[in-house]
Amino acid sequence: MSSLSTVAGFLVSRLRQIGIFIALVAIVVLFQILTDGTLLEPRNVTSIVVQNAYILILAIGMVMIIIAGHIDLSVGSVVALVGAVSGVFAVNWGWPWWASIIASLVVGGLIGAWQGFWVAYVGIPAFIVTLAGMLTFRGLAQIVLDNRPITPFPDGYVAVGAGFLPDPSDGTSYLEWVTVTLGVLAAVFLVAQQLRERRARVKLNLEDEPFAWFITKLAFIAVLVLGITYLLASYQGTPIVLVILAVLVLVYTAVMNRSIFGRHIYARGGNLNAAQLSGINTKRVDFLLFVNMGFLAALAGIAFTARSNSALPGAGNGFELDAIAAVFIGGAAVTGGIGTVIGAMIGGLIMGVLNNGMSLLGLGTEYQSLIKGLVLLLAVAFDVFNKSRGSKSAT
């Protein structure tokens, strides 16, 4: 009984972090029932991954921006502009697809540097700079495209957003074994990482996670990864964009948790004056954050354009709102200083499953917008409630 009460106390203390996991699982179970099992069919799971990858890529950069106390309203327009530019490179000018992608990423970084300069060194609030960017880059995208789509793109380019890892069995086996191998390796890696981190915390007497909960968490991680692996391997295997996303999540999680730059981002968002007094070059942090956001927005634009096989003037409409919603649903604080890459990914998946589930049920876009708005409001209200409860208990 004492073990159960210990676990319960731990869960209550970590309600903010664990709550989004519970919400995601509950939403998946709900729509799996309402759609008579269609939600978790292999084809639909693959569709959810491919359709939401570019939003998740944007959410990685956006959570870093929001942790630092800023916001970026221009990412949807950057998606459109980079798609337009890459269309000119790859289709109109006939560049190799890989050269078009590299050049487009450079363009995205330059866009981020432009906005970062105004925010970091001129001192204009990010809201205003990126609002201006949203209008400017949308207009530039329409000018570059002359308000007409550019299509089709080279096969290599399209594969980035719509392709799958090669299947050596040519579809003759029941499960695509490359995906199975990657899934098993991913499960082993994640479990080993959790064990290593727990051992380090125990050695420093910092471990407060009950062992029973730790084992339950490990089992859940393994079952989740292997379950997704089975569903992907039952259809066409691993989408290339999922591999890109997984690498980004690993890299940026390490940056935020283990690097000096990551600690500077949290410090800048938690208390700007204290960060400056401690010697952190906050202007440099802000500048690099927007360069990074431009790079990731360009990558998201490439993924979206590749999936569409077309550069569209209206591409990216509303993407900034989806990315911001994913970050706040994933547990980031409105005031900055709090948030995680993993939380943003879970928030993005919640939005993606909601979109997909409501589409399967035949709900119109008006109802989808209504429900997503309410979910976002409830997520932020839950964050405010947790903060007020914490401050009351502290006093």
What label would you give each PLM region?
Residues 126, 153-156, 172-183, 237-243, ...:
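Loop-to-transmembrane alpha-helix initiation sites
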Residues 290-301, 307-373:
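Transmembrane alpha-helical segments in multi-pass inner-membrane proteins
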Residues 139-256, 313, 391-395:
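Transmembrane helix-bundle core of multi-pass membrane transporters
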Residues 193-208, 250-290:
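Membrane-helix/interface signature in polytopic inner-membrane proteins
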Residues 94-135, 346-347, 351:
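Alpha-helical transmembrane segments within multi-pass membrane transporters and channels
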Residues 37-47, 146, 229-242, 253-257, ...:
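Inter-helical junctions in multi-pass inner-membrane proteins, predominant
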Residues 28-93, 114-127, 142, 256, ...:
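Single transmembrane alpha-helix segments in multi-pass membrane proteins
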Residues 1-29, 149, 186-219, 227, ...:
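Cytosolic-side transmembrane-helix boundaries in multi-pass membrane proteins
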